[in-house]
C-alpha cells in the first residue's frame, strides 16, 4: 500500500507542475507586476478586496492565454529543443485538457472582472486574452515576421487594465505604460530568436532572423532599444518623485541600449543571451521603480 502511495505522489506532483507550466508562470509574474503598477499609480483609491480580485483576474487571464497558446502551438513546440519539454509535447498534459483549461480560465477571469471590478476592465482583459490567443497565436505567429510587434499589444494591456480597475477610464499615463511594454517586447523576443533562429526555421515560424537575416534583426533590436530608452523617460512627467524615477530609468535604459549595441557588433551567442536575460530583469526593475516613485 505504501509503495503505491509513494509511486502516486511523484506522478501527482508532475501533473500539478505540468498544469502550472501550462499557464506560463514566468510571463504571468511580469503581467501581474505591470497590472499592479497600473493600479498603484492610478489616481483615487481602490478597496483592497477589489485590488486583489483584479490582480487575480489579470493572473488567470494571463494563464488562460498561455494555456491556449500551448494548446495551439504544441505541434511546433515538439519540434524545438527549447520547447519540447513543455507540458503537452512531453506528455504531461493532454491537448484537450489544455484548451479546456484555457477556455474555462478565460471565462472565469473576464466574468469576475466585469462583475466585481468594472465592465471596462473586463472588456480590456477579454481583448488581451483574445488578441494573444486568436490574433497572435493562431494568425500572426506563423504568417509574418511582425508577429511579435503586433502581438505585443496583448502583453502591453495589463497596466491599462490595472489603471481602469481603479478609475474606470483610460488615460495618457496608462497609455505610456502600455507603450513601454509594447516597444520593449520586440527587442526582447528578437534577442531570443537570434539564439534559436535555426529552430524557428525548422518549425517554419517566420521570425525576423529567419525571414530577414541576422544583421537586419540586430539593426531592429538596436533601433527599438533606443526608442524604448526615450519612451521610458516619459513617466517622469507624472510620477511624484520624478528625480528618483529618472535616476533609475536612465542607467537602466542606457544599459539596455548598451546590450543591444553589443548584440549589433557581435556574433557571440552569449551576447544574445545576455540581452535576452537583461531585458527581463530590466522590465521588472523599471516597473518597480515606477511604483516606488509614485509615493
Curated annotation (Swiss-Prot):
Q: Which pathway is it part of?
A: Porphyrin-containing compound metabolism; heme O biosynthesis; heme O from protoheme: step 1/1
Reactions catalysed, as given in the entry: heme b + (2E,6E)-farnesyl diphosphate + H2O = Fe(II)-heme o + diphosphate
According to its UniProt record, the EC number is: 2.5.1.141
Which lineage do the record's taxonomy fields give for this organism?
A: Bacteria, Pseudomonadati, Pseudomonadota, Alphaproteobacteria, Rickettsiales
Record's protein name: Protoheme IX farnesyltransferase
Q: Which GO terms describe its molecular function?
A: protoheme IX farnesyltransferase activity
Pfam families associated with the record: UbiA
Q: Tell me which species this is from.
A: Ehrlichia chaffeensis (strain ATCC CRL-10679 / Arkansas)
According to its UniProt entry, one GO biological process term is: heme O biosynthetic process
Further information in the entry reads:
Carbon 2 of the heme B porphyrin ring is defined according to the Fischer nomenclature.
Q: Tell me which PANTHER family the record gives.
A: 4-HYDROXYBENZOATE SOLANESYLTRANSFERASE, PROTOHEME IX FARNESYLTRANSFERASE, MITOCHONDRIAL
Taken from the UniProt entry, a GO cellular component term is: plasma membrane
Do you know which HAMAP family this protein is assigned to?
A: CyoE_CtaB (MF_00154)
Bilayer topology annotation: Multi-pass membrane protein
Amino acid at each position: 500500500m505504501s509503495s503505491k502511495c509513494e509511486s502516486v505522489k511523484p506522478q501527482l506532483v508532475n501533473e500539478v507542475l505540468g498544469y502550472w507550466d501550462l499557464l506560463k508562470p514566468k510571463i504571468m509574474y511580469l503581467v501581474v507586476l505591470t497590472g499592479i503598477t497600473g493600479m498603484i499609480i492610478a489616481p483615487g483609491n481602490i478597496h483592497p478586496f477589489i485590488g486583489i480580485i483584479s490582480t487575480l483576474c489579470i493572473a488567470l487571464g494571463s494563464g488562460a492565454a498561455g494555456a491556449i497558446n500551448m494548446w495551439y502551438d504544441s505541434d511546433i513546440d515538439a519540434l524545438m529543443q527549447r520547447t519540447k519539454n513543455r507540458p503537452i509535447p512531453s506528455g504531461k498534459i493532454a491537448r484537450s485538457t489544455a484548451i479546456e483549461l484555457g477556455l474555462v480560465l478565460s471565462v472565469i477571469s473576464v466574468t469576475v472582472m466585469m462583475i466585481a471590478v468594472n465592465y471596462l476592465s473586463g472588456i480590456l482583459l477579454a481583448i488581451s486574452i483574445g488578441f494573444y490567443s486568436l490574433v497572435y497565436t493562431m494568425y500572426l505567429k506563423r504568417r509574418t515576421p511582425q508577429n511579435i510587434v503586433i502581438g505585443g499589444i496583448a502583453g502591453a494591456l495589463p497596466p491599462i487594465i490595472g489603471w481602469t480597475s481603479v478609475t474606470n477610464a483610460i488615460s495618457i499615463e496608462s497609455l505610456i505604460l502600455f507603450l513601454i511594454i509594447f516597444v520593449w517586447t520586440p527587442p526582447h523576443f528578437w534577442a531570443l530568436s537570434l539564439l534559436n533562429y535555426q529552430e524557428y526555421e525548422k518549425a517554419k515560424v517566420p521570425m525576423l532572423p529567419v525571414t530577414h537575416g541576422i544583421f537586419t534583426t540586430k539593426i531592429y533590436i538596436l533601433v527599438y532599444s533606443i526608442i524604448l530608452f526615450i519612451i521610458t523617460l516619459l513617466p517622469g512627467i507624472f510620477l511624484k518623485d520624478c528625480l528618483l524615477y529618472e535616476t533609475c530609468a536612465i542607467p537602466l535604459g542606457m544599459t539596455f541600449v548598451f546590450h543591444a549595441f553589443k548584440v549589433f557588433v557581435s556574433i557571440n551567442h552569449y551576447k544574445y543571451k545576455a540581452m535576452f536575460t537583461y531585458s527581463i530583469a530590466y522590465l521588472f526593475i523599471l516597473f518597480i521603480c515606477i511604483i516606488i516613485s509614485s509615493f
